[in-house]
């Protein structure tokens, strides 16, 4: 609480004292102790590297069905890959995270259908890489990249992420070969 006092005089119409409630959120050096909103504020200010280091983790809890697999309160760590990586192309003031540790062990999220060509955690639903990463089943359907974090595709990994994390996600441009099928190193294939 802050109280502002006005000096005596007649050149104002303000009350002699005014009390205001103020809420201050200060980031801590322990990444996991911060809310995703606080992490986003620090990131947007370009100060992430002043508080945290590459490898620091923040626990998230996955809940929901992703394709045919149901996550039920699975705690997984998101960890910092870097700060302002490739900022000239991807934008400044970003903290880059990767999901995939339980404790300190790297894990891959996958279902029992990975060896089938059905609707599981697969790159594509047929034995092809046609369309490259941009049109892949993994990107559009499993990960849910065909919608936005605040309105995720149903039954996608994006929808299984905590809402407070999805609320602060920022778009980042990643350059990938979106044509596939062995087209070679051709500049126009990269988008």
Language-model segments: residues:
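C-terminal edge beta-strand
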Residues: 16-26
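N-terminal non-cleavable signal-anchor helices
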Residues: 5-7, 23-25, 173
């Amino acid at each position: 609480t802050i109280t502002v006092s006005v000096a005596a005089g007649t050149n104002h119409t303000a009350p002699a004292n005014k009390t205001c409630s103020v809420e201050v959120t200060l980031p801590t050096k322990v990444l996991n102790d911060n809310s995703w909103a606080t992490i986003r504020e620090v990131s947007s200010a370009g100060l992430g590297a002043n508080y945290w280091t590459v490898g620091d983790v923040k626990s998230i809890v996955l809940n929901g069905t992703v394709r045919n697999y149901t996550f039920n309160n699975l705690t997984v760590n998101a960890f910092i890959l870097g700060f302002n990586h490739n900022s000239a192309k991807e934008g400044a003031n970003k903290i880059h995270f990767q999901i995939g540790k339980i404790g300190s062990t790297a894990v891959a999220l996958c279902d029992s259908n990975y060896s089938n060509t059905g609707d599981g955690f697969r790159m594509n639903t047929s034995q092809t890489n046609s369309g490259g990463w941009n049109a892949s089943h993994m990107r559009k359907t499993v990960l849910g990249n065909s919608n936005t974090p605040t309105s995720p595709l149903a039954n996608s990994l994006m929808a299984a992420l905590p809402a407070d994390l999805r609320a602060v996600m920022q778009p980042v441009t990643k350059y990938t070969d979106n044509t596939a099928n062995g087209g070679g190193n051709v500049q126009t294939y990269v988008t």
